[in-house]
From Swiss-Prot:
Disulphide linkage map: none
Function: Required for hemolysin production.
Family of this protein: Belongs to the CvfC family.
Protein name, UniProt field: Conserved virulence factor C
Keyword Magnesium part of the UniProt annotation: no
Alphabetized Pfam families for the sequence: HEAT_2, Nfu_N, Virulence_fact
GO function term, MF aspect, one: oxidoreductase activity
Gene source species: Staphylococcus aureus (strain Mu50 / ATCC 700699)
Native organism taxonomy: Bacteria, Bacillati, Bacillota, Bacilli, Bacillales
Entry keywords, A to Z: Virulence
Record flagged with keyword Chloroplast: no
Amino acid sequence: MEILRIEPTPSPNTMKVVLSYTREDKLSNTYKKVEETQPRFINQLLSIDGITSIFHVMNFLAVDKAPKADWEVILPDIKAAFSDANKVLESVNEPQIDNHFGEIKAELLTFKGIPYQIKLTSADQELREQLPQTYVDHMTQAQTAHDNIVFMRKWLDLGNRYGNIEEVMDGVLEEVLATYPESQLPVLVKHALEENHATNNYHFYRHVSLDEYHATYNWKTRLRMLNHFPKPTFEDIPLLDLALSDEKVPVRRQAIVLLGMIESKEILPYLYKGLRDKSPAVRRTAGDCISDLGYPEALPEMVLLLDDPQKIVRWRAAMFIFDEGNAEQLPALKAHINDNAFEVKLQIEMAISRIENGDEALGSVWKQMANRTI
């Protein structure tokens, strides 16, 4: 059994290892520690420092690494674990992987709906910041003698961000303070004490009209409107289109997120505006939305992103072309084959290989990997 190629996946902590052997049992397994009953090559891989789990299905492995582990160290060890290591993709030894590549997960720690701490997690770093003391004080006021604080704390997913983690923290802090202004804290405390149950998850949705939004001059209020906006419909497009021109990046980003919820090809022109935004975070978010929608009609616009100055945006473009592209995109892919970012270069090589081999897009495989049992 040999390794045919190594491919990146949407997660910076997971690599796909394509094998020359296909499982005949059509089953899948997840391995997390060395055990005698497991295949020898699986145990060899799990013995590599930094590898945390392996998912084996069909003819490939999804290899997960620890967030602080480096692919540039792990990949040669993966090759060496197979008998014919010299046939593995030799180029993986050459480029240097940037540990700061990819997504930064943003989370907000709350107690009974009252926020008091932000956590950011990147591929190799975790950063936390407590909100101003008044938030902690109000959180304390919401406690009762019978509350199990540890059990009742909740991490709210704020979505992914991109860029320098310290700068991202500044931006997320600004967003949180705008979404939960100090003036709202007494209301949250009152609600928490009135409800007084362990599953309290105070959040409300409120639809606003274009006129009301347009008449709002405070950007923090505009952001709050978007954060509390229900799932949008076609009738909300004028409002969201207006928000795309906002001077504040968090507002534009949230407008893109909401537009991406309208699952229709008619929304693509508005997402294209996001691809041209001056903020790389907004451009990447727009690319993520287009990727989630999966409309091949977006290929010409995504091809243009291969020239984006930010590698997080170029990577998303190459990934989309891999998922949806065809022979028409080969010239553009080959023109960018020497991208100086390891992840982008590998993704471009993978897209070229898939298209030239006539293989179908692997969207269903990514879905299977995402839904696998951990």
